[in-house]
Amino acid sequence: MSNNDNNLPDTIRGAARIRLGHSELAVRPIGLGCMGMSQFYGPADDAQSVATIRTALDLGVDFLDTSDIYGAADVNMGAEIRGFGHNEQLIGEAIAGRRDEVVLATKFSARLTEDGKDIVMDGRPEYVAEACEASLRRLGVETIDLYYCHRIDPKVPVEETVGAMAGLIVQGKVRAIGLSEASVEQLRRAHGVQPLTALQSEYSLWERGVEAEILPTCRELGITFVPFSPLARSSLTGALQGGASFAAGDFRASNPRFASENLATNLVPVETLKAIAESKGCRPGQLALAWLLLQPFDIVPIPGTKRAVYVEENLTATNVALSPDEIAYISSLFAPERIVGQRYAPVHAAHVANAK
């Protein structure tokens, strides 16, 4: 990767890189999640998405997150929308000629059934190899930096899946491996086969279920934690109102926490967050990201956006200072018992070890 920071904006130039697990990979404190460029959050323009990714690189973002499934299914697991691998193809186009500027993370295991109406998990060793080859082609790269098992296949021992992933490292097709949405037990079993570099799961002020066991286990094992939805699907930006409605294809339309009977309650502490942010001269989302970055764990959040302006706004969170008392107060505002509703609808929870 390129280490020339001279042309980067002040918002990120001075940010120290974080080493991912025990690997040789190191990234800046905030990455970019690219899923929304292909599905779940309304229409997306491919040209705009490619431009956003390239602007992110210009701004110093060096950690991009995708998956082969992004673009393949709508929120209700119905018919194909953009196509399996669409998001990887977008990223491949965006990073062409700039590969050395990026730590590239993608995932496998989730695939559509033949009728396109459901998603199944496939952790068979033969599928691990097949999926990796396909991702390499779509991304237009020779090596994937960080390869995750997106969801663990309950039909295949995790040791077999991870063993096949370890084989990809030996073959030079992958530099490091990780899991997504795994339980502590699955994490330990997998780590016993091949040291894991990263675990990805949801974590934000709104969703703190990983704090009790997952995060301490990651710290014990030397695994970097990569939170997705660190802004709680825009809830922590201050942009949503209690009466917000979502289009049928929007992930939030079927998410219990965004149901009308829950959303108003869940947004109450956001009003206080907005006031604190105003007093500190920053945006609520920046404050929420700063809180996350200041947790006592190795964490690299990957907020997603389709618009370049929000990439820059998110990066500025690295400049927000919080005292220990401020961190504790903000934590208390979003105590888990104050957030109502499960974090996944049943159709998605079925594939997640820690879905509550």
What do these predicted ranges mean?
Residues 20, 32, 49, 64, ...:
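Conserved, mostly hydrophobic/aromatic
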Residues 28, 35, 116-117, 217-276, ...:
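Glycine-rich, positively charged active-site loop/lid region within alpha/beta enzyme cores that binds
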Residues 111-209, 213, 224:
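Glycine/proline-rich, positively charged
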Residues 36, 68-70, 108-112, 148-153, ...:
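Active-site-proximal loop/turn and secondary-structure-junction residues that shape catalytic pockets
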Residues 1-102, 356:
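N-terminal binding-site loop/beta-alpha segment at the start of enzyme catalytic domains
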Residues 27-30, 60-62, 98-102, 141-145, ...:
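Short, well-ordered coil/turn segments that N-cap beta-strands
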Residues 169, 261-319:
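Conserved short secondary-structure transition element at the edge of the structured enzyme core
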Residues 22-41, 105-119, 143, 148:
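N-terminal small/glycine-rich loop or linker at the start of catalytic domains
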